[in-house]
Amino acid sequence: MAKYTPNELADTLKEGLLSFPVTSFDANLQFDEENYRKHLAWQASFPVAGLFAAGGTGEGFSLTPAESERVVRTAVDEVGSRVPVLASAGGSTAQAIENAKAAEAAGADGILLLPPYLTEADQAGLVEHVSAVCRATSLGVIIYNRANAIYKDTTVATLADRHANLIGFKDGVGDLEHDARVYAKLGDRLFYLGGLPTAETFALPLLQLGMSTYSSAMYNFVPQFALDFYQDVRNQDRAAVNKKLNDFVIPYLDIRDRVKGYSVSIVKGGLDAIGRSAGPVRTPLQNLAPQDLADLKALIATVS
């Protein structure tokens, strides 16, 4: 059973840093539950506001439904008493409903609703898609604005009016006008989180558009740095943010951008670099090349 009402969950998540733990695999690319539990326990030992199990950084796209449910259950069991645990729901409307129900049964506290799978939809279709999921669960639901699910401000307002358990808007597009429209129309009815890759890059300007938090991938391997960066953002300390961008985040981006798909691979590479390996990534992703891993390890040493 969820430990938070939707409103309580929103109030908790919007005031702190969020992260998507990687999913641990063994050498045969099978879920390594023991190692995953160790990683979660370490992550939860820092003051993170919420963890999203089996999300994008957790290679949720490479997990079977049964694996995803097991990952979520493991996360709830290991750290659910200390930090909110959220799960993803995606695919077709029917699949997203199944995901949401399974997450609720597993004890998750909330749902991140991913875009429908490989199909285009108009705003009316998106309203029905989100509505079906919100009706299927009592958990707080966060919609993810990206790719083929771009929610107009009027659409978000319609959904917020219909469903009290719609609590959040995550943006993975970066259209500033769009974000401004949504925040201006909805205000405090929702909470807003940044979801662009390596969200630290955009965190300070997006704070002005109501995005008080974001999902940090690098929290997986440099949690204290990630928390310090987040605090600098919330303090609107531009000098401190820019220093951290120049010293670490931008060089990190340079390594990430060497190969398509490194956005996830580099996070597991970061764990390799600090001696807390979560195993390899599953295909179609590729593990970091040796030189890229060496460069990342040297970079991490500058902030550890």
From Swiss-Prot:
User: A Pfam family in this protein?
Assistant: DHDPS
The keyword Lyase is assigned to this record = yes
Q: Does Glycosyltransferase show up as a keyword for this record? A: no
Its keywords, alphabetically, are: Lyase
SMART domains on file? DHDPS
Specify the domain of life of the species encoding this protein.
Bacteria
In the record, what terms sit under GO molecular function? 4-hydroxy-tetrahydrodipicolinate synthase activity; 5-dehydro-4-deoxyglucarate dehydratase activity
Q: Copy the pathway line from the protein's UniProt record.
A: Carbohydrate acid metabolism; D-glucarate degradation; 2,5-dioxopentanoate from D-glucarate: step 2/2
Under catalytic activity, the entry for this protein gives: 5-dehydro-4-deoxy-D-glucarate + H(+) = 2,5-dioxopentanoate + CO2 + H2O
Q: Name one GO biological process term.
A: D-glucarate catabolic process
Enzyme Commission number(s) of this protein: 4.2.1.41
Q: Which PANTHER family match?
A: 5-DEHYDRO-4-DEOXYGLUCARATE DEHYDRATASE 2-RELATED, DIHYDRODIPICOLINATE SYNTHASE
User: Which family does the record assign?
Assistant: Belongs to the DapA family.
Query: What protein name applies here?
Result: Probable 5-dehydro-4-deoxyglucarate dehydratase
Task: Recall the taxonomic lineage recorded for the source organism.
Answer: Bacteria, Bacillati, Actinomycetota, Actinomycetes, Micrococcales
